Every structure is written in C-alpha cells, then in structure tokens.
A protein has these predicted regions:
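Ligand-binding pocket scaffold of soluble enzyme catalytic domains
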Residues: 666-669
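C-terminal accessory extensions/subdomains outside the catalytic/core fold
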Residues: 712-734
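Short, charged, amphipathic alpha-helical segments
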Residues: 675-683
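Short, well-ordered surface patches within globular domains
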Residues: 683-684, 690
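Extended, well-ordered protein cores
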Residues: 2-265, 274-497, 501-661, 688, ...
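A glycine-biased, small/acidic residue-tolerant capping/turn segment at secondary-structure junctions
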Residues: 693-710
Length: 734
C-alpha cells in the first residue's frame, strides 16, 4: 500500500497540521493509501542527537535520517512542510525549553574548550541552519504557482507600492574582495581532496581531508575578504547617511549557517565600530559575539557592573545617533535589522522591499526608502536589476503579470547550500590550497578572519536538471532561461555541461543569460503578460521562488513545489514562505491562526497525482481530481483565512476545504463507492455550517496555552486547533 509521510515541523504550519491532518486521514481512509507522520521539528531533531542523556520514555528516533533513507526508494511520497532553519539564538531557546520540560540536555557551548564541549557542539551543529532540506532534496526542483492560485491573484490583485524614477532606494554590493571575485573552479576526475592552510611561516593546518568527489563533479573554491567586507559596510553607511536612506543588511544567516552569521557579525561590528574599539575588553569579558547580533549584546551587558553597562549603552546610543537610521523588524519594540541574524532573511526581505516601493520600516513605524546591502555580487545584481526596472517602468501589476515557474538545481546538496562542512573562518594569514595528493588544484591567499568555502555539484544532478528544464519547456511551450554568468568561474563550468547535455530542442526558446540580464529579459516578458521558466542553481532557486511569487500572487506560501526524486519517488514541499512565527504569536495571544494552508492542499493534490501514476489499486486519481476542483471552489469563494478576529481563520478554512472536497467526491461518477461514502458527509457539512463556524470562531479572543513553543503539549494544541465538536464528529465518522 502506498504511504504518504506527512512531516511534523514547527511554528504555524505545525499548528495547522493539528487541524488539517485528521481531515486528510479521514478522506484517505479506505482509499488504498496510508498516511503517517515523521517528526523533523527543531525539538525533535535536538532530542534525536542525545539519546544517551534521555530516559527511555523521552528518547526520539532520528526521523530525519530515516526520511533521508526513504528518499532513495522509488516508493517515497513525502509531504514536507516548512520547518525552522535554526539560528544559534533559536537553538538556545529550544534547548532551554526542553530543559525546563525535564529533558537533561547539555547547554549549547558558545566557545567549546574541552573535548566534551566540542563533542556537544558538534552534535548541536547538525541541527543548525538548513539541516533538513539537504537531506531530503535528493532531486531537482519544479516549483510553480498552481493555475487556480495564479488566476485568483489576477482577479484579486494584491497591493503593490508605486515606483517612480525619483525613488532613491537601491541595492549596494561589493565590487572587489567578495566570493564572486575570488572564485576558482575545476571539474574533478573522481579525486579525493584535502583542504590545507599554509601559514606565512610555512606551517600547514589541514582544514578538511579525504573529501571524496565523483568523476565529472564541479568543485569551487572561493573566499570573502573580511577587510573588503568591512570597507564595503563602512562605505555603504556613509552613502545611506548622505542620502537619508535606511541602512539594511540582507543575508541568509539561517541556511548559510557558517558563512553568513560572520558576514552579519561584521555588519554589527562596523555599525558599532567605535563601541567595539573603546569597550572591546569589557564586551569580551562577558562573551559578546557580534555574529549573534545586538539582542545578544544587550543581554550580555546585564552581566557587567551597572556603571560600566550604562557607559556602553550610552556609547551605543551615540553611535545610533551618528549613523543612518537602521531598518526595523519591530518598530514598537525597538527590534532592528541587526538584533539577530535570523530576523531579516534575504529571500523574504528583498521581494518585500520591491513590493513596498523600495521601503522598509523605520524606528517611527513609517516606511522609508532603504539602501539594501547584499555584499556578494553573485546574486546581488539580479535584485539591483529588479529595482532599476521598477524605477524605469513603474511597479509591476499582479492583475496582468506573466508567470515565472522555476526549475532549480538542488539534488545531492548542490552548490553553496551544501557547502557548510567545507566552509571555514581562516584562523591566520596564509594561503589555502585544495590538493589531490601532491597536485595543487586551487591556491588562494587569505588573511585571518576571511571566510573560505568549497562548493560542489555532481554530474548526475546537472544532467537531470537540464532534462527537467527541457521537459517543462516542452510541456508548457514556454521559453526557458538558464541563469548562468559566463564571467563567474562556477557558472562557466556549468555552462559547459548545459551545452553538452542540451538535447535537440528545435522549436523551443532556450537561453543562457547572466542573472542581471536574465532578470531584465524576464521582467520585460512579465510586463507583457508572458510566462518565462527560470532555470537556476540552488541559491537562485531559493531566491526567485520567493521574489516572483511574492510579486505575482502576494506570497510564496501558496507555491506548488514538486521534487521528482532521482530514485523515482516524490517530495512535495508546501510553499516557500517559512514557518511564520508572527502567526504563532497572534495565536498564543488571541486564539487566531491566520496561516494559509493552501500550500498543503496543493502539495497533497500533487502527491495523490504522483501515487496515481506510480501505483495501482488506489483511489488516488479520483481523490486528486476532486481535490483540485475543491481548491478551485475554495479560491473562487475566497475561503482563505481572514486577518480579523471574529472571521474564519486557518481552522475555518479547513472546514471549507473539507466541505468542497466532500461535495466533489459525492458528485463524481467514476467511483460509486466513494460517491456514496461522501454523500452524507457532504450533506452534513453543508447543513451544519452555521453551528460549525460558530464553534470554530467562538473561541477567538482569549490567550492559548500551548505548553511550549518549540515542543508544545500535543493534547493542548490538538484541543485548541479542533474546537468544533460538530465538525470533529463528522470527520471522525469517516
């Protein structure tokens, strides 16, 4: 029997699953399809790392490893919801919560100095950053807006800020010393590689050894000069001050868990350079690490004598007065862009800047134009191209915009998103060599503090990526653009492979353009209402599948993301919009969850279609077809969660999905048994509408006790997310 694995994850989508999953289980019962769950939440992954410290009844299996093995099976059917990519502050908060619940976990060691602390740090490192996606994404990505979602967005266009040629907001990026500048690339002959740092005194330090590569694998080596980075930040601060722009920094300190926290920390240090220069000894004495942001710094100041802490706070206030205004995350509570590295994440933040006329929030809670700092040129230029296009041609129009689906190269930890184990903060001056035996393959002069990294992409994923791009171009009769820059070392190697693997494609419009040029070409087509497939590497896959959905349909959470696994199974991801902690905060405060589960609905439909194509003896095809019609009715009748208390929230939207789906199943003529089974259910759901909605909406307005944030009490949350006894009884009758 085919089995769907529904992932247990974090925050808003986790809460929504307590309501939605029982409905899905009821509808699939007796269909020849089983459904089970797998815990890959942050708390679950933490507990799985410490079985030796837990009681028998506290131990948790390593579900992520189990799912990783499952991706190698042709029978895999995994619905993967958004999970937390944990920053260090989030990890510490989750550990503290679990400790308070009686789990004897060790503290996270900030600066491990003993073998035991280093071993603990290594275990915790496995759950930091994007620990889940590289394990599960054993295939390339086919991500697009469902037809019904795109049609709804055109009929009900979301708000877009206005653009004129007077808008000063822009992107600032480095022009030397960045990852783009230093990149070297070669194609492996299946060698085992070592990474060695040779000091100025000739001493050798092995940073990594025995790195096994496959024949035809592209290997890159590059580094970020932190001196050049500091120079860039200082220059951009001066520009922002001069032009009265907000200063903002856009990185991905969650996914790029080794490199980007350091880049973020240099932004903090540069902004407060006088404070760190004058009070460095005091700050070091209480363990201040700028990589953790201003929030952590303020917390640690409380450990200093009151007089000393007050002097430092005064110096910080003086720096804020002298610097350009900082972009704010929470103006009411004084939370800035620099408070923590996970608060402003580039793939979500930059599309919002474009949508909001180049603005972010200032300390007064008003929108103000920003200088958006994106240090590395590898991807910054395409964001600059969007803002330049809007400045020249005005805001994009969601009512007429074309569509930009994406085919993304991500299988087998492709490119930068798989580079964490081979990313290093250089401990001293010297040169870093990548060697195979005595053969030196790359050689780069570095200085202490520079961020050096090796990225890789194997040949089979590239072949499959090209195949998938051509397949989507043929099916949709849409131009496909490979976003590759011949002047970037890595991209030049990929271009060689793309040209070698492109099959005969007469009648198809296939292009290879640098990211900025690809963006200009795509935007010109979008403005004419024309569709264009973006074919990108792993990072641009992530960025573009937020940029275009947010501009086209107002959110990336409603995207359909299908990952045809290389082994033949399917991974179905629900949206690209993260796990929405603000939604959880509202739920806890007033029992109202505005998370939109449309992404889950669409992923379930795609999964059922896949099962129908790969398995016999199930009712998956009929379930998928009727679910698709139900989603259409759901959108046409505007049943997504409202944003105001007293109206239907996430739970109410699940009622409407169940009602429309049951109605479609009862009305179809392909399976009499299903029609008969859902006839009474459809009738009951319609007849009890008023009672069900009264029970669902009546609980709103009061605080909710979840019994925990990262590791909530399941009974408490289930009770809160299923408050309608009438609705529950109908679903349980299935």
């Amino acid at each position: 029997m085919p089995t769907i694995v529904w992932t247990k994850i974090d925050e808003a989508p986790a809460l929504a699953s307590y309501s939605l999953l029982p409905i899905v289980e009821g509808f699939l019962d007796g269909s020849g399809i089983d459904i089970t769950t797998s815990d890959i939440s942050l708390a679950g992954r933490i507990l799985a790392q410490f079985p030796d410290r837990l009681n028998e009844d506290q131990k948790v299996a390593d579900h992520l490893a189990e799912l990783g093995e499952l991706t190698g099976s042709p029978d895999a059917n995994i619905i993967k919801l958004p999970n937390i990519s944990a920053s260090v502050p989030q990890l510490k908060a989750a550990i503290a919560e679990l400790q308070s619940q009686g789990y004897e976990l060790p503290d996270f060691p900030d600066k491990p100095s003993t073998d035991e602390e280093r071993e603990i740090a290594a275990r915790y490192a496995t759950v930091l950053g994007s620990a889940v996606n590289p394990v599960l994404r054993q295939g390339n990505s086919d991500r697009r807006a469902p037809t019904a979602v795109k049609a709804y967005a055109k009929a009900h266009p979301h708000r877009m800020g206005q653009w004129t040629d007077q808008v000063k907001a822009r992107v600032a990026h480095m022009d030397h010393g960045d990852f783009f500048d230093h990149e070297e690339s070669f194609v492996s002959r299946g060698q085992d590689l070592d990474v060695v740092l040779i000091g100025t005194d000739g001493s050798e330090t092995t940073l990594a050894s025995g790195i096994k590569t496959l024949d035809g694998e592209i290997v890159d080596a590059t580094f970020m000069s932190v001196d050049a980075l500091d120079e860039f930040y200082a220059s951009s601060l001066a520009q922002a001050n001069e032009e009265d722009l907000l200063w903002s920094v856009h990185l991905k300190a969650t996914m790029m868990k080794v490199s980007d926290p350091v880049l973020f920390g240099h932004a903090v240090r540069t902004f407060l350079v006088d404070v760190f220069d004058k009070y460095g000894d005091d700050l070091n004495s209480v363990g201040v690490n700028p990589d953790l942001g201003l929030g952590d710094l303020y917390t640690r100041l409380e450990k200093l004598p009151a007089e000393r802490a007050a002097a430092i706070k005064a110096a910080i206030d003086f720096a804020f007065a002298a610097r350009p205004a900082l972009a704010m995350v929470d103006s009411d509570n004084g939370i800035t862009n620099l408070h923590a590295g996970n608060l402003v994440i580039i793939d979500a933040s930059m599309p919002t800047v474009v949508r909001d006329s180049g603005c972010m929030w200032n300390a007064e809670g008003k929108r103000q134009e920003t200088l958006a700092c994106i240090p590395d040129r590898s991807y910054a230029t395409m964001y600059a191209a969007i803002m330049d296009d809007c400045r020249e041609h005005g805001a994009l129009d969601p009512a007429t915009m074309g569509d930009v689906p994406n085919v993304g190269l991500m299988a087998q930890k492709a490119e930068e998103y798989g580079s964490h184990p081979t990313t290093f903060i250089v401990p001293h001056d010297g040169r870093v060599e990548v060697r195979c035996g005595d053969e030196v393959l790359t050689n780069q002069q570095v200085e202490a503090g520079d961020v050096w990294r090796m990225s890789r992409v194997r040949d089979i994923p590239v072949r499959d990526w090209v195949r998938l791009a051509i397949e989507r171009a043929r099916i949709t009769n849409t131009p496909a653009v490979f976003w590759l820059d011949k002047n970037r070392a890595h991209d030049a190697r990929v271009i060689e492979k793309v040209k070698a693997y492109l099959p005969e494609h007469e009648g198809l419009d296939i292009r290879i353009l640098a990211p900025a040029d690809a963006m200009k070409f795509t935007l010109a087509r979008i403005r004419r209402g024309e569709d264009t497939i973006s074919v990108t590497g792993n990072v641009l896959r992530d960025y573009l599948t937020d940029v275009f959905p947010i501009l086209e349909i107002g959110t990336s959470a409603k995207m359909l993301s299908v990952v045809p696994l290389l082994a033949g199974g399917g991974l179905f991801e629900t949206g690209a919009g993260g796990s929405a902690p603000k939604h959880v905060a509202q739920f806890v405060a007033e029992d109202y969850l505005r998370w939109d589960s449309l992404g889950e609905f669409c992923a379930l439909g795609a999964c059922l279609e896949h099962i129908d194509q790969t398995s016999e003896g199930t009712k998956a095809g009929i379930l998928a077809a009727t679910l698709d019609k139900a989603i259409g009715a759901f959108l046409e009748n505007d049943r997504s969660p409202a944003r105001k208390l007293g109206q239907s929230d996430n739970r109410g939207s699940h009622y409407w999905l169940a009602r429309y789906w049951a109605s479609e199943l009862a009305a179809q003529h392909d399976d009499a048994e299903l029609a008969d089974r859902f006839s009474d259910v459809a009738t009951e759901l319609a007849a009890r509408e008023d009672q069900i909605l009264k029970e669902l909406n009546g609980v709103q307005g009061s605080p909710v006790d979840m019994g925990g944030y990262y590791h909530p009490d399941e009974e408490l949350v289930a009770e809160a997310m299923r408050p309608s006894t009438t609705f529950n009884a109908i679903i349980e009758s299935l």
